[in-house]
Amino acid sequence: MIPGGLSEAKPATPEIQEIVDKVKPQLEEKTNETYGKLEAVQYKTQVVAGTNYYIKVRAGDNKYMHLKVFKSLPGQNEDLVLTGYQVDKNKDDELTGF
């Protein structure tokens, strides 16, 4: 992987689902929407001064969105921060940097 580049897409893990669960309130505040279960489906990572996670989530039957979540380096402020999102995605949309 190229430093600063995106990794290959990988199936979501329990750790990625936990990240989605933790940033869900931030997403709801930013979109002014309330979501039921957000299911992590796939993700990519980008190593910066910490890690950006690009996560595809299913937010309903055929509703998908992409989340960008920043996790700082260990020992720094360890809060997860939702730094971007894209709504109106479908299951076949590729995760890209945004």
Swiss-Prot record:
Stored SMART domains: CY
Tissues where this protein is expressed: Expressed in the skin throughout the epidermis.
Single GO biological process annotation from the record: peptide cross-linking
SUPFAM superfamilies linked to this entry: Cystatin/monellin
Keywords for the protein's UniProt record, in alphabetical order: Acetylation, Cell adhesion, Cytoplasm, Ichthyosis, Protease inhibitor, Thiol protease inhibitor
UniProt-annotated location(s): Cytoplasm
Gene Ontology molecular-function annotations: cysteine-type endopeptidase inhibitor activity; protease binding
Coiled-coil stretches: none
Superkingdom of origin: Eukaryota
Motif annotated as Secondary area of contact, chain positions: 46-50
Keyword Acetylation listed: yes
Residues recorded as bearing N-acetylmethionine in the entry: 1
UniProt-annotated site: Reactive site, residues: 4
PROSITE patterns on file: CYSTATIN
Cellular component GO terms, alphabetical: cornified envelope; cytoplasm; cytosol; extracellular space; nucleoplasm; peptidase inhibitor complex
Family to which the UniProt record says this protein belongs: Belongs to the cystatin family.
Disease per UniProt entry: Peeling skin syndrome 4: A genodermatosis characterized by congenital exfoliative ichthyosis, sharing some features with ichthyosis bullosa of Siemens and annular epidermolytic ichthyosis. PSS4 presents shortly after birth as dry, scaly skin over most of the body with coarse peeling of non-erythematous skin on the palms and soles, which is exacerbated by excessive moisture and minor trauma.
Function, as annotated: This is an intracellular thiol proteinase inhibitor. Has an important role in desmosome-mediated cell-cell adhesion in the lower levels of the epidermis.
UniProt-recorded name of the protein: Cystatin-A
Species in which this protein is naturally found: Homo sapiens
Native organism taxonomy: Eukaryota, Metazoa, Chordata, Craniata, Vertebrata
